Amino acid sequence: MLTQFMNALAGPGPSPDILLPAGGSLPSVFAVSDLAQASVAAAGAALARLVGLEGASAPAVLVDRDLASAWFGFSLRPQGWTLPSPWDAVAGDYATADGWIKLHTNAPHHRDAALSVLGVDGDRDAVAAAVSGWEATALETAVVTVGGAAAALRSVGEWDGHPQGRAVAAEPLLQVGSTSTAPSAGTAGPDDRPLAGVRVLDLTRVLAGPVATRLLAGWGADVLRIDPPWWDEPAVVPEVTLGKRCARVDLATPGGRDRFLDLLGSADVLVHGYRADALEGLGLGPDIRDDARPGLVDVSLDAYGWTGPWSTRRGFDSLVQMSSGIAHAGMVTTGGDRPVSLPVQALDHATGYLLAAAALTGLARRRAEGTGSRWRTSLARIARLLVDVGSAGGLVGDGIDPEAPRPADPVEHTVWGGVRRIPPPVTVAGAPLHWSLPAGPLGTSVAAW
């Protein structure tokens, strides 16, 4: 998988030595730990290439397989407090009249949408009873139509034959294009903080995008995350806001749009994870963004790909696993009687590290060629990669526990309490990952550089 990532990135700069020592594997019918190690290595290699542009050889990259697998779960270990559950009480898998469906109801408006279709309140037993009378694809369509998030269980073969599955399979792993000439190619930071001075504007939520920007912050980037006034994700904020400042701006208002464009005008990188048509609907399409910041490195993801009938569909890692055949293959291969998902949100995390690699490669291209670039991928395309590598034909892995690695000694002091983090999964020689800011709540910083 690393070869596929590196071929998709194809950045300038000298190639580094990449060391991938053996380790354990997360228990799965798919090569989840291979995906973890390869995606983290792609990001490390992209940084090494960027550093190598300054005239020295590219520094060596080492990725600890067990730590990469663990960072695909949670990196933090709360000291004397607990994280809330990431799942709403209604969220999960339900048997339908002809199969299975997953309802994703963590966001209040998604929960309201699903319950409005089913005509029940939030009692899980009532939801299960109502779902049992529906065909899976009919309920999926009904929930999505009213603005909810749901996915019927499909096999790999069914997804291969679905119009959206075919569209995703035809897309490259990374879609990339050059944009306008940058007024300045940028300069390198100090050897140990190679992204110092790089400004990253973060319009992402939950996991994939925040994983990308967290990594960039760890190498010294100034990351400013922007959320709307009403958004929160308390179960993951302590995990993904490490190293970032977080502000609130309502992009749907004229003042908020102007504020965003002002911030964008001084940014080096924009990472966004809204649905494919969302920024365009706010009057912030790609041409507007490029005009606001010539030479911008514009990096984005969506759930179901950028072409096909579902290109603007709401989606999350767990839903894409249902749609793409991953959860079905897990069920069939293990002899289970219900969908079997991956042991971690692997699509989110792998996509996040690939986005970080794309951002770093975009910075390298701007430094080498003087132009901006636009990069896109999707959770569904990463799922396609994982499926193409193949199922092991049974549950593989030695039972590595993503909670097992011993956390580092330094305590990160947060508003929630003390936190210890497990050691970083990647080492780029001379540029250790470390974060200058602790994780913090959303909306606690001013929307300014």
What are these regions (language model features)?
Residues R205, L251, R275-A276, D302-A303, ...:
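Short glycine-/small-residue-rich Rossmann-like dinucleotide-binding loops
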Residues R245-D291:
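A structured beta-alpha segment of the ubiquitous adenosine-cofactor-binding alpha/beta core
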Residues A247, D258, S318-M322, Y353, ...:
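Feature representing long, continuous alpha-helical segments
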Residues G308-V344:
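Rossmann-fold dinucleotide-binding core
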